[in-house]
C-alpha cells in the first residue's frame, strides 16, 4: 500500500449554512470568544433585566402585588393626616382646659370670659370653648384607624404572597434556562470553566437573585409608596416647610448613589472569591481518596482558607460602607427634625400660617418619606447583590454556543458510508492556544475498515477522535464525512452515528439497564440484554442481586474498572453506530473478558468504520490500516507488515514491545506466539480521552483511589424507578432539628469584643427612636403652652437635642455596621473552614453515602455558612437594636401612664404569636427547599462533571428533564411558603393600626375622665407604636433566622460526627522502625453502601518487608479493595490487617498512611503547578525543589517538563486536564517517589504509558521498589512475573499463591490465566 495519503475533493455542501465557516473566521471566532469572556466579567446587569424571565402571568402577578404594596404604603401617610387633625383637636382642648383652670375664667356662650370684665373686653380677648366633644371625636378617629388596619391586613397578605409566587416562578425558569444553556455549550467552553464554579453559581448566585426579585420587591415598593405619598401630602399641606425639610435630600441621594456602587463592587469581588473557594472544595471532595492517601487534608484546608480570606476582606468592607451609610442617613434625618421644628415653629407662632396639626402633618409626612427612603435603601443592597450575581448567570445564558449540540441547524445525510478525511488539520485547545496539538494532519479513514492510531503519548491520537465527534472544530483545515465538511452537518445527528468507548468510562448514577439504554433511548429490554451479552457483561450483571436494576453509583463507583468498561461497551453497541471509536476500550479488562469483548467488537466490524486508538497488539496487528502519529501529524500509514518493512514509528514501538515479550517468554511460556490475543497484555501507547485538554474538569477521576465512591442514584433514565422511590427514606435521614442559637454564637465567641461594641452601638441606636418619640410629644405639648416666649425657648431646646441625636447616630451606626460585619464574616469563614475540615476528616465510607456526593457537599459549604449569618453578624445587631427599642419604648410608656400602656400591650402577644408561627413554618420550608435543591445540585454536578460523555452519547435532554422535575418540587414548596409568610407579615403590619385604634379610644376616655394630659397619650401611643414596629421588624428577620438555624444544624451534625477512622486523631500506635510487613488474616468485607455484596470473603495473605506481592484475578474479585483496607479507607468487617504485627485498626491513621505511597491506574492531579503536584507526595514537611526534581528524573518526567514554556511552574489544569495520561501518570509516580514510603502500592501504575515511556518508567518503579514492601495489581501478567509472591484472587479469597515459576509448575488457575485467559474459579 502506498505511503502517501490521497485526499478527495470536498463537496462544500451547504456553504450558506452558518455552521460551515471559513478557517480564518473560525479561528478568529475562538479568539474573540476568549476576549468576550474577559470583557464580560465586568459586565453589569441592569435591575429590570433581573425580570427578563417573567411571563404575562408573572407580569400580572407582579402588577397586582405592586398595586397591593403601593396601596399598603399609602396607609401610613394617610393616617398622618388623620393624626394631624386629631393633634389640633387635642391642642385646642388643652388650651381650653388650661384657660378654664384659672379661677376667674368661665365658659359662656362657647367663649371663655373673665367673670369681672366688661362685655367688650371679653369679646375682644375671649377664647372659644365647649365646641370640642373629645369623646365623639376620638371614637370617630378610632374607627378610621381600625378600618385602615383591616385594609392593611388584606393588602399586606397579597403583596407578599403574589411577589413570592412570581419570584419562585421566575427563578424556576431562570434555573431551567441556565442549565439548558450550559448543556448546549461546546466542549471548549467547559475547558475554560470550572465545574465547582458553575455549581456555586447554581446555588449561591441564583439564590441571591431570588432574594432580589421576590418579597424584597414588595417591601421596596411599599416603602417607596410611603415615601412618595408622604412627600406629596407634605407639599399639599404646606410647601414652604416641605421645601426646607427637603433641602438636605440631595445629600441623601448622592450618598445612596455612591454607596450603591461601592456595595455592588464589593459584592462582586466577594462572590468571585467564594466561587474560587467553591471550585477548590469541589476539586478536593471529588478526589478525596487521593487527598486521604497523601495526607493532604491540612494543606487543602489551608488552600481553601486562603480564598476565604479574600471573600472575608470584601465582606467587611461592604459592612463598613453600609454602616456608614445608615449612620449618615440617620444623621441627616435628625438634622432635618431640628431644622423643621425650628422653621415650622416660626410659621406657627410668628406668622400664624400653619396650625400645630398642619406642622405635625407636614413634618411627619416628609420624615416618614425620608425614613422609608432610608429603609428602602436596605433593599437596594439586596438588589445590587442580585444584579452582581446575575451578571455571570446572564452572560452564560446570553452566550451563543459556537457548536450547539441541541440545535436543529445543519444537514442530515440520508445514508452514510462512514468515510472520514482530515484535510490539513491544525488544532490547539482553547485553554492552551500556545500548544499546537495537531499540525497539518491529513489522512483518510475508509468506510467499513478498522483503522488503528498508534504513536507516543500526546501525539494527537485522541484529539483526532474528538474532532471527529465535533467536540472541537479545527483551527485550520477541515474534517469531512463522506465528502461533507462535518461543520455543515447537524451535530446531534452526527454524534448519533458515532459510538465511543473510552479508557476511563463514565457511568451515571442510575441502574445498569438505564446506563445501557442511554446509548439509544428507544431501546427495549431485549436490546439491552443483547448488548450486554455482546459486551460480555451479561454474566456478571445476572450475578448481582438486583441484576439489570442494580444501581451503579456516581461515575459507576459501585463497580470494578472491568465491569464499568463492559457496561460502557454495551452502551456503545446498543447504538448500532456507523462509526465506532475505541479509545483503549478494553484496557481495564482481564484476559478472558478482553478476548471475548474483542470478539464482539470484531463481529460488528462489517459495515462499520472502526477507529481504535493505541489498542493491544492483537487489535493493532489485525487492523485493516495502521496510522502512525508523531507530533500531531500522520507520518505513516499501512498494514502491520507494510509498516514493519518501513521501519518507522510503528516498527520502533513493535520492537520495544517484542523485547519485553521475549523476556517474558524466557521465564516459562514456551512455544506460544506472543502476538496472539490471549497472551500477556501490552499497550502500544497511551492517548487518553483527556489528552492535553480539560476533559477531566467534568471527568471525576474514579481511579482505584477515587472510583469506589458509592454515590446517590440520579434520574437520568426512568426518573421514578431510580430516584423517586428513594425519596422518602432520604428525607428521614436528612431531617435535622434547628440548632440552638447559643451554640451558633459560641462559634463567634472569639469575636466577642466586636460583638460587644457592635451590640452596645446597636442598643444606643435602638434607644434613639423612643427618645425621638419623647422629644416629639414634648414639642406637641409646647404648642399648647399659653406663653409664646416659653414655647419658643422649649422648641429651640428640643431642636438642639435632635442635632445631638444625629451626631450620635452617625458614630454608632458606623461602628455597628463595621463590628458586626467583621464578626459575621469571621464566623462565616470559620464555619466554612471548619465545615470543610470536618468533611475531610470523615472516613471514606461517609463519602460513599448517597447524601454526601461532591455536588451536595460543595453546595452545602457555599450556602449553609453564609446563611448562618442570619442568626449572627449584622442580624444580631438588628435584633439588639429592636429589643432595646422595645425595652426603652415600653419603659417610657409605663412611666407616663401605666393604664394606657397596659391596654396597648394586650396586642403584643398577637405579634409574638404571628412571629413564632412564621419562624416555625419557614424553618420547615427552608429545610425542604434546601433538600430539593441539593438533589437538583447532584444532577447538575453529575452532568457537568462528565460533560464529554453526556455530549458524546447525546443525553443532555435527559439530564435537563431530571433537573426540571426537581425544580417543580422546589416551586411547590415556595407556593406554600408564600401563604404562610404573607399571612404572618400582614398580621404584624395590621396589628399596629388596630392597637392605635384601641389606644386613642381609651386615651380619649382618660383625657376626659381622669384629666390626663394629651401629650402623655401621644407619648405612650408613639412609644408603644415604635416598639410594635420594632417587633414587626424583628419578625421580618425570621426567614433568614429560620434558614440560619437549619444551616447551622447541618454544620453541627457534621462537626459532631466522630468518624470510625479519624484522620485528625492523635490516638493510635506509632513505632520508630517501620518495616512494612503486611498480613491479611481472614479478612471479610462489604462496602457500607452495598452491604448485600460480599467483596472479601476471608482474604489471607502475607508479605515480608522488602518483598513484592502481586494480586491477580478477574475484575471485581477484591484486589483494589485489599489496597483500600491497607490504606485504612475502610476497616474489615471481620478479620485483621496486620502491619509489622500491629492491628491496623489500632495504628494511628496519619502515621500509617505516611508510610504508604500509591500510584493508581487513573491518577488524580490537582489544579496547581507540576512542582506543587510532585511535592504533594509528602505533606508532612516542606519538600525542597532539588528533591522534587530528583523524583521527576527517576519517574522519567524531567525532560518532558523542561520542554514546557513554564517548566515546573506549568499549571496542570483541573484534574490534570492540560496533560496527556502518560504525562499525568509520570507526575503521579514522581509524587509517590518523593514520599519515600516503606510500602508502595502500584495499581496498574504503567497502564497509561506508551511502550516507550513504559519501559523506562517500569525501570524507575523497579528501582523505587528496592528496600520497600510493594503490592502490585496488574491485568498485564508480564509486569508482575518478577514478584516475590503472586496471589491469585477469586470471589474475595486467595485461591493460590507463590512465585511465577512455582505457579506455572502447579498448572493451576494462574497457569490457565497466563496461557489461555481462562476464568479464575
Curated annotation (Swiss-Prot):
EC number of this enzyme: 7.6.2.-
Summary of the tissues where the protein is detected: Expressed predominantly, if not exclusively in the liver, where it was further localized to the canalicular microvilli and to subcanalicular vesicles of the hepatocytes by in situ.
UniProt biased composition (Basic and acidic residues): 662-684
Domain ABC transmembrane type-1: 62-385, 755-1043
Chain positions carrying an annotated carbohydrate: 109, 116, 122, 125
TM region(s), chain numbering: 63-83, 148-168, 216-236, 241-261, 320-340, 354-374, 756-776, 795-815, 870-890, 891-911, 980-1000, 1012-1032
One GO-annotated biological process of the protein: bile acid metabolic process
Domain ABC transporter positions: 420-656, 1078-1316
Keyword terms, alphabetized: ATP-binding, Cell membrane, Endosome, Glycoprotein, Lipid transport, Membrane, Nucleotide-binding, Phosphoprotein, Repeat, Translocase, Transmembrane, Transmembrane helix, Transport, Ubl conjugation
Principal subcellular localization: membrane
Pfam families for the chain: ABC_membrane (PF00664), ABC_tran (PF00005)
Catalytic activity as recorded in UniProt: cholate(in) + ATP + H2O = cholate(out) + ADP + phosphate + H(+); taurocholate(in) + ATP + H2O = taurocholate(out) + ADP + phosphate + H(+); glycocholate(in) + ATP + H2O = glycocholate(out) + ADP + phosphate + H(+); glycochenodeoxycholate(in) + ATP + H2O = glycochenodeoxycholate(out) + ADP + phosphate + H(+)
Compartment list: Apical cell membrane; Recycling endosome membrane; Endosome; Cell membrane
Signal sequence extent: none
Function: Catalyzes the transport of the major hydrophobic bile salts, such as taurine and glycine-conjugated cholic acid across the canalicular membrane of hepatocytes in an ATP-dependent manner, therefore participates in hepatic bile acid homeostasis and consequently to lipid homeostasis through regulation of biliary lipid secretion in a bile salts dependent manner. Transports taurine-conjugated bile salts more rapidly than glycine-conjugated bile salts.
Comment text on domains: Multifunctional polypeptide with two homologous halves, each containing a hydrophobic membrane-anchoring domain and an ATP binding cassette (ABC) domain.
Record's protein name: Bile salt export pump
Protein species of origin: Mus musculus
Lineage: Eukaryota, Metazoa, Chordata, Craniata, Vertebrata
Amino acid at each position: 500500500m502506498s505511503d502517501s495519503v490521497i485526499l478527495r475533493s470536498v463537496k462544500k455542501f451547504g456553504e450558506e449554512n452558518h455552521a460551515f465557516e471559513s478557517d480564518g473566521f473560525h479561528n478568529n471566532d475562538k479568539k474573540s470568544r476568549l476576549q468576550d469572556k474577559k470583557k464580560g466579567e465586568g459586565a453589569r446587569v441592569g435591575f429590570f433585566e433581573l425580570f427578563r424571565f417573567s411571563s404575562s402571568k408573572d407580569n400580572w402577578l407582579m402588577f397586582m402585588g405592586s398595586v397591593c404594596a403601593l396601596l399598603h404604603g399609602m396607609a401610613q401617610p394617610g393616617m398622618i393626616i388623620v393624626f394631624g387633625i386629631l393633634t389640633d383637636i387635642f391642642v385646642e382642648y388643652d388650651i381650653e382646659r388650661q384657660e378654664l383652670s384659672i379661677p376667674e375664667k368661665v365658659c359662656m356662650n362657647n367663649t371663655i370670659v373673665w367673670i369681672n370684665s366688661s362685655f367688650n373686653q371679653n369679646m375682644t380677648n375671649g377664647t372659644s370653648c365647649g365646641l370640642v366633644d373629645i369623646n365623639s371625636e376620638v371614637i370617630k378617629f378610632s374607627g378610621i384607624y381600625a378600618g385602615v388596619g383591616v385594609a392593611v391586613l388584606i393588602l399586606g397578605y397579597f403583596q407578599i404572597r403574589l411577589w413570592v409566587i412570581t419570584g419562585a416562578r421566575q427563578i424556576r425558569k431562570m434555573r431551567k434556562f441556565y442549565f439548558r444553556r450550559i448543556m448546549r455549550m461546546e466542549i471548549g467552553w467547559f475547558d475554560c470553566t470550572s465545574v465547582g464554579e458553575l455549581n456555586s453559581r447554581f446555588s449561591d448566585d441564583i439564590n441571591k437573585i431570588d432574594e432580589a426579585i421576590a418579597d424584597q420587591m414588595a417591601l421596596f415598593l411599599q416603602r417607596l409608596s410611603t415615601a412618595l405619598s408622604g412627600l406629596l401630602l407634605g407639599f399639599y399641606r404646606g410647601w414652604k416647610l416641605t421645601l426646607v425639610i427637603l433641602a438636605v435630600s440631595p445629600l441623601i441621594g448622592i450618598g445612596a448613589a455612591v454607596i450603591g456602587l461601592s456595595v455592588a463592587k464589593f459584592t462582586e469581588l466577594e462572590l468571585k472569591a467564594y466561587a474560587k473557594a467553591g471550585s477548590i472544595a469541589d476539586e478536593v471532595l471529588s478526589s478525596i481518596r487521593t487527598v486521604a492517601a497523601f495526607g493532604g487534608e491540612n494543606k487543602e484546608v489551608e488552600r481553601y482558607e486562603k480564598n476565604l480570606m479574600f471573600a472575608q476582606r470584601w465582606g467587611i468592607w461592604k459592612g463598613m460602607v453600609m454602616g456608614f451609610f445608615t449612620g449618615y442617613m440617620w444623621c441627616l434625618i435628625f438634622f432635618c427634625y431640628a431644622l423643621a421644628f425650628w422653621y415650622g415653629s416660626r410659621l406657627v407662632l410668628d406668622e400664624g400660617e400653619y396650625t400645630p396639626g398642619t406642622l405635625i402633618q407636614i413634618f411627619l409626612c416628609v420624615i416618614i418619606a425620608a425614613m422609608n427612603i432610608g429603609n428602602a435603601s436596605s433593599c437596594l443592597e439586596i438588589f445590587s447583590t442580585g444584579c452582581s450575581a446575575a451578571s455571570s448567570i446572564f452572560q452564560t445564558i446570553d452566550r451563543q454556543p459556537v457548536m450547539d449540540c441541541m440545535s436543529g441547524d445543519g444537514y442530515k445525510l440520508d445514508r452514510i458510508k462512514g468515510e472520514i478525511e482530515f484535510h490539513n488539520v491544525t488544532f490547539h485547545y482553547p485553554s492552551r492556544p500556545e500548544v499546537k496539538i495537531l499540525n497539518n494532519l491529513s489522512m483518510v479513514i475508509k468506510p467499513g475498515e478498522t483503522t488503528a492510531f498508534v504513536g507516543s503519548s500526546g501525539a494527537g491520537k485522541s484529539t483526532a477522535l474528538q474532532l471527529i465527534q465535533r467536540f472541537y472544530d479545527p483551527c485550520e483545515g477541515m474534517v469531512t464525512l463522506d465528502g461533507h465538511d462535518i461543520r455543515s452537518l447537524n451535530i446531534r445527528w452526527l454524534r448519533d452515528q458515532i459510538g465511543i468507548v473510552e479508557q476511563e468510562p463514565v457511568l451515571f448514577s442510575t441502574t445498569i439497564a438505564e446506563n445501557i439504554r442511554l446509548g439509544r433511548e428507544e431501546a427495549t429490554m431485549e436490546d439491552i440484554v443483547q448488548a450486554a451479552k455482546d459486551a460480555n457483561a451479561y454474566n456478571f450483571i445476572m450475578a448481582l442481586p438486583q441484576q439489570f436494576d442494580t444501581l451503579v453509583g456516581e461515575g459507576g463507583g459501585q463497580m470494578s474498572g472491568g465491569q464499568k468498561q463492559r457496561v460502557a461497551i454495551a452502551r456503545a453497541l446498543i447504538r448500532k453506530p456507523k462509526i465506532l471509536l475505541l479509545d483503549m476500550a478494553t484496557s481495564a479488562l482481564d484476559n478472558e473478558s478482553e478476548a471475548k469483548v474483542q470478539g464482539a467488537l470484531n463481529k460488528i466490524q462489517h459495515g462499520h468504520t472502526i477507529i481504535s486508538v493505541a489498542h493491544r497488539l492483537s487489535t493493532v496487528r489485525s487492523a485493516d490500516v495502521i496510522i502512525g502519529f508523531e507530533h500531531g501529524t500522520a507520518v505513516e500509514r499501512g498494514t502491520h507488515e507494510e509498516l514493519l518493512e518501513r521501519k518507522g514509528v510503528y516498527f520502533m514501538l513493535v520492537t520495544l514491545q517484542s523485547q519485553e515479550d521475549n523476556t517474558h517468554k524466557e521465564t516459562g511460556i514456551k512455544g506460544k506466539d506472543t502476538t496472539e490475543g490471549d497472551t500477556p497484555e501490552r499497550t502500544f501507547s497511551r492517548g487518553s480521552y483527556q489528552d492535553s485538554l480539560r476533559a477531566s474538569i467534568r471527568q471525576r477521576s474514579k481511579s482505584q483511589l477515587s472510583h469506589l465512591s458509592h454515590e446517590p442514584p440520579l434520574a437520568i433514565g426512568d426518573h421514578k424507578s431510580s430516584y423517586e422511590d428513594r425519596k422518602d427514606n432520604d428525607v428521614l435521614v436528612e431531617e435535622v432539628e434547628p440548632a440552638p442559637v447559643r451554640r451558633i454564637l459560641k462559634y463567634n465567641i472569639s469575636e466577642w469584643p466586636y460583638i460587644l461594641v457592635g451590640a452596645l452601638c446597636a442598643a444606643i441606636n435602638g434607644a434613639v427612636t423612643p427618645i425621638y418619640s419623647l422629644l416629639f410629644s414634648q414639642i406637641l405639648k409646647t404648642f399648647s403652652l399659653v406663653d409664646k416666649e416659653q414655647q419658643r425657648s422649649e422648641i429651640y431646646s428640643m431642636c438642639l437635642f435632635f442635632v445631638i441625636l444625629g451626631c450620635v447616630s452617625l458614630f454608632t451606626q458606623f461602628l455597628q455596621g463595621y463590628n458586626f460585619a467583621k464578626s459575621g464574616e469571621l464566623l462565616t469563614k470559620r464555619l466554612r473552614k471548619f465545615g470543610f475540615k470536618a468533611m475531610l476528616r470523615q472516613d471514606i465510607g461517609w463519602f460513599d453515602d448517597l447524601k454526601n456526593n461532591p455536588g451536595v457537599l460543595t453546595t452545602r459549604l457555599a450556602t449553609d455558612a453564609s446563611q448562618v449569618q442570619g442568626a449572627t453578624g449584622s442580624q444580631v445587631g438588628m435584633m439588639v437594636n429592636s429589643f432595646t427599642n422595645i425595652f426603652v419604648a415600653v419603659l417610657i410608656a409605663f412611666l407616663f401612664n401605666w393604664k394606657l400602656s397596659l391596654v396597648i400591650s394586650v396586642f403584643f402577644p398577637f405579634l409574638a404569636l404571628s412571629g413564632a408561627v412564621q419562624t416555625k413554618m419557614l424553618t420547615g420550608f427552608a429545610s425542604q427547599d434546601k433538600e430539593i435543591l441539593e438533589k437538583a445540585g447532584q444532577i447538575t454536578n453529575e452532568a457537568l462533571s462528565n460533560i464529554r460523555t453526556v455530549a458524546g452519547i447525546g443525553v443532555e435532554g435527559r439530564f435537563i428533564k431530571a433537573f426540571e422535575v426537581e425544580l417543580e418540587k422546589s416551586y411547590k414548596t415556595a407556593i406554600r411558603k408564600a401563604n404562610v409568610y404573607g399571612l404572618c407579615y400582614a398580621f404584624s403590619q395590621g396589628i399596629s393600626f388596630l392597637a392605635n385604634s384601641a389606644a386613642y379610644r381609651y386615651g380619649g376616655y382618660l383625657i376626659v375622665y381622669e384629666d390626663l394630659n394629651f401629650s402623655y397619650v401621644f407619648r405612650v401611643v408613639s412609644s408603644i407604636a415604635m416598639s410594635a414596629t420594632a417587633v414587626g421588624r424583628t419578625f421580618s428577620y425570621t426567614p433568614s433566622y429560620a434558614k440560619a438555624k437549619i444551616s447551622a444544624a447541618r454544620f453541627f451534625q457534621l462537626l459532631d460526627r466522630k468518624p470510625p477512622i479519624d484522620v485528625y486523631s492523635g490516638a493510635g500506635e506509632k513505632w520508630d522502625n517501620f518495616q512494612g510487613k503486611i498480613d491479611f488474616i481472614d479478612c471479610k468485607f462489604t462496602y457500607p453502601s452495598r452491604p448485600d455484596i460480599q467483596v472479601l470473603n476471608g482474604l489471607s495473605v502475607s508479605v515480608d518487608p522488602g518483598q513484592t506481592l502481586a494480586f491477580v484475578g478477574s475484575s471485581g474479585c477484591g484486589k483494589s479493595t485489599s489496597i483500600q483496607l491497607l490504606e485504612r479507607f475502610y476497616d474489615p468487617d471481620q478479620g485483621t490487617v496486620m502491619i509489622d504485627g500491629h492491628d491496623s485498626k489500632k495504628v494511628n491513621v496519619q502515621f500509617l498512611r505516611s508510610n504508604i505511597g500509591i500510584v493508581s491506574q487513573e491518577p488524580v492531579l490537582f489544579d496547581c503547578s507540576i512542582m506543587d503536584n510532585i511535592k504533594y507526595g509528602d505533606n508532612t514537611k516542606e519538600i525542597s525543589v532539588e528533591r522534587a526534581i530528583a523524583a521527576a528524573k527517576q519517574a522519567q518526567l524531567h525532560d518532558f517538563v523542561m520542554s514546557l514554556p513554564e517548566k515546573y511552574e506549568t499549571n496542570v489544569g483541573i484534574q490534570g486536564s492540560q496533560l496527556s495520561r502518560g504525562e499525568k501518570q509520570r507526575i503521579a509516580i514522581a509524587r509517590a517517589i518523593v514520599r519515600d514510603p516503606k510500602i508502595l502500592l502500584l495499581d496498574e501504575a504503567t497502564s497509561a504509558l506508551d511502550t516507550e515511556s513504559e519501559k523506562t518508567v517500569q525501570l524507575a518503579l523497579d528501582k523505587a521498589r528496592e528496600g520497600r514492601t510493594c503490592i502490585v495489581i496488574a491485568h498485564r501478567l508480564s509486569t508482575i512475573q518478577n514478584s516475590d509472591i503472586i496471589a491469585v484472587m477469586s470471589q474475595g479469597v486467595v485461591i493460590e499463591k507463590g512465585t511465577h515459576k512455582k505457579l506455572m509448575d502447579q498448572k493451576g488457575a494462574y497457569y490457565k490465566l497466563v496461557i489461555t485467559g481462562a476464568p479464575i474459579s
